[in-house]
């Protein structure tokens, strides 16, 4: 096998392959990428056995063939090579890589392609299209709420379904929940799916901002295509919780605060917060939100910022990361917390049941947060 390629075009694709590959052992075939040179293009395949990736790069082929090489070393060679043409030559198990712009050559050992796991074709699958921007926004607003508790494996991915002509993505770790709805476009019916975080992260990082992407959910797998890229993943097997029961209804009160003010105040007051607890107290009164970091081994802090609220004095304790994570992706100037007030013993008003955090005006996503005890 012998071909030449453009270094910059190749490095973009190999960097994506590296995201897929988790086994870094040079003796494991899963540490390799499969290269297939034919029809003046190079097909590149990578997998960790669960997530699979296929892409195509234009190359000039002198001799067709296929092989596998250690992805990590190939990426290091590309990273240290100058832009321009690079020659790739395979003879038996030896691969020679020669950048045209430098008097240097590298030699790698290859493994035969018949040892590489089969990555099947997605032809004839029932793909539907969705705006890439919409799907990426669905991921952005849910991925941080996915649980990392392996004992509750059915919550270690984002739930994706079609209902009432809408596409919905939901994630929860049991203490917070994020939900996004988008138009279903021309999507056909499919079985609701729990999508692993890894493929969602790859799509979020690599899908374009403009145009559409194609999605198919079939046979306990999801397939995603855009540009010259195709990703697929085995879905998480399990029963996702009934998320609709978690979303509170009939909330009668709200506080609105400037997003930038809240973000900056949280960054300051959480400097001394106990990171094992991550608790911040919100004390809300007419026109004023006071953020309090309770006294810890590091110290204490509080800060007042203006807000729009004209009800009784109330308070609630929240895990501050459950607030800062949505703040990173909410784009509106102001954010709103919707809630109901509970009267506790002693007459002090507090919020102890689920709170909805959202944009203002309301968008197609919500973030549900359970208050903490304090």
Enumerate the predicted regions with their spans.
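Structural preference for solvent-exposed beta-strand-turn elements
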Residues: 1-374
């Amino acid at each position: 096998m012998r071909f030449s390629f453009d270094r910059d075009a190749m490095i973009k694709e190999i960097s994506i392959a590296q995201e897929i590959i988790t086994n870094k052992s040079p003796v494991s075939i899963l540490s390799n990428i499969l290269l297939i040179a034919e029809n003046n293009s190079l097909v590149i395949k990578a997998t960790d056995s669960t997530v699979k990736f296929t892409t195509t790069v234009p190359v000039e082929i002198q001799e067709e063939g296929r092989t596998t090489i250690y992805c990590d070393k190939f990426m290091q060679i590309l990273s240290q090579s100058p832009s321009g043409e690079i020659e790739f030559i395979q003879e038996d198990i030896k691969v020679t890589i020669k950048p045209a712009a430098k008097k240097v050559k590298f030699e790698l050992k290859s493994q035969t392609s018949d040892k590489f796991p089969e990555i099947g074709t997605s032809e004839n699958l029932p793909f539907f299209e969705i705006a890439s921007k919409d799907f990426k926004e669905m991921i952005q607003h849910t991925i941080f709420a996915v649980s990392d508790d392996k004992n509750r494996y059915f919550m270690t991915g984002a739930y994706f379904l079609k209902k009432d002509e809408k596409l919905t993505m939901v994630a929860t770790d049991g203490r917070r929940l994020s939900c996004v709805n988008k138009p279903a476009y021309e999507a056909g019916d499919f079985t609701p799916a729990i999508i692993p975080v890894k493929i969602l992260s790859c799509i979020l990082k690599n899908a374009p901002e403009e145009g559409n992407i194609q999605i198919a959910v079939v046979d306990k797998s999801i397939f995603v295509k855009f540009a010259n890229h195709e990703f697929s993943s085995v879905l998480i097997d399990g029963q996702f919780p009934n998320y609709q029961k978690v979303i509170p209804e009939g909330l009668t009160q709200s506080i609105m605060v400037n997003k930038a003010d809240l973000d900056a105040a949280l960054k300051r007051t959480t400097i001394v917060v106990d990171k094992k607890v991550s608790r911040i107290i919100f004390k809300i009164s007419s026109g004023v939100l006071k953020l309090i970091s309770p006294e810890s081994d590091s110290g204490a802090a509080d800060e007042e910022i203006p807000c729009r609220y004209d009800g009784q004095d109330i308070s609630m304790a929240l895990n501050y990361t459950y607030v800062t994570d949505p703040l990173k992706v909410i784009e509106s100037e102001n954010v709103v917390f919707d809630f109901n007030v509970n009267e506790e013993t002693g007459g002090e008003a507090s919020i102890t049941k689920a709170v909805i955090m959202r944009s203002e005006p309301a968008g197609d996503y919500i973030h549900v947060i359970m208050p903490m005890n304090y």
